[in-house]
Amino acid sequence: MIFRGKVEAIGSTDEPIIFERSDLNSAWGTIALQDNAANDSVLENIKFIGGSGGSEYGIQYTSMLSLHNVSNVLLNEIELIDNSIYDDALHLVYCKNINLSNIKIYQSYRDAIDIDLSSNIYLNNLIIKNSGNDAIDLMDSSVLVMSSLLTNSKDKGISSGEGSNTVVYNTKIQNNNIGIAAKDSSTIALIDNLIDSNNLDLSAYSKNWQYANGGNAVFYNSSINRMSIEVSKDSMLAMDSFSKKRYLADDELSSSLIIYKPVDLYNKEIDGLLLDLEKYK
């Protein structure tokens, strides 16, 4: 079901809108918002259960809920459960100013949320459990993640890659294979988070030869286990004094930091919040 116009689909807590399988053995396809005419859409109190993906007019939809080339869209009180066949539960590409609040995603086939080539994506109060791959996968995007729980992913809690800029605030990232991955000229700022009980809490590295550097991670007011971090030579790790005391590895730390107060994360262009790496070099 592809929507090429503005959608206002608003259920209620007692009577949510539900998309589910009519045949338990056969997955349905995708619900997609496509192109600028679908800007300013609102989806609220909706459950998506057992979908997959699809294609139309040469456009491939790799998730059961897809946002393609839209802006100023609100998703609130959404559940996505048990997608199959296609990789993602929720996919955003070529999007801007998207607000996802109070989202629950369980048992995604691969990535729970995949965000590509998008800017100013706000993710607030997410619960993502048991992802088949990553909880959140980012490519060349700017994203703010707040007040969320990302747990039991078979691969990464957050994978920030290919030039992405990401702020993660007040979020629990636990019991994943890798908690945070920063790679390929991406920067991730981690503020007031709990990142623990992952097989590896943080990995910063190069993967794609087209990018000159590895990944960059900046910790503010966070506890991190130095035995659970891997940082390649072309990556950067920096911390404020609170985090530094808990890490105890002075030779790996940047000499200076720009610090943002958590309140400054609200109502801002995300790229404007992030760190200018030239100031560390």
Segments (PLM) and residue ranges:
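Beta-strand/loop edge motif enriched in small/polar residues
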Residues: 1-281
